[in-house]
């Protein structure tokens, strides 16, 4: 059972024009795919999906998708937002199959950021989410990055993070030890340098 529930209707009217008409009627087009079933086009009320994804945890939890009374467990795979107005324009969901691994992007939470700042450093958040591979039951709500011991010059890579049990960082599994955050000395503006001379 999941805390996140989303209602949808099957959609047969497809194409750009149909999607535009849907958005004008305060609904959005979506698709669900994966598992051993065919992809299915959906219609979801814009206010319902917007409310669901106001909670950051919904991005990294299993969602119960109720399509015309038929329930299935899914995760969000992709979401398209309007570039200027930020409302949701389209969503892709992937069915969750028990015992099978899935990939999902999980938000990064940085803690103890004040420690390097007190030492005169500035923090750059290089990644705001990390792609993980795991079974749905092991999907973490977020990945925690502790900056408490970071100094100026510290670069925190994926390999520096402890993955929760049953969870693998996808990039690291492919040999890409990405930087997640770094601490650097404050940059001095060129005008400030000139004024100091």
From Swiss-Prot:
Membrane-spanning intervals of the chain: none
The protein's name: Large ribosomal subunit protein bL25
Subunit structure: Part of the 50S ribosomal subunit; part of the 5S rRNA/L5/L18/L25 subcomplex. Contacts the 5S rRNA. Binds to the 5S rRNA independently of L5 and L18.
Native species: Pseudomonas putida (strain ATCC 700007 / DSM 6899 / JCM 31910 / BCRC 17059 / LMG 24140 / F1)
UniProt record, GO biological process: translation
Family under the similarity heading: Belongs to the bacterial ribosomal protein bL25 family. CTC subfamily.
Keywords: Ribonucleoprotein, Ribosomal protein, RNA-binding, rRNA-binding
Listed GO CC annotations: cytosolic large ribosomal subunit
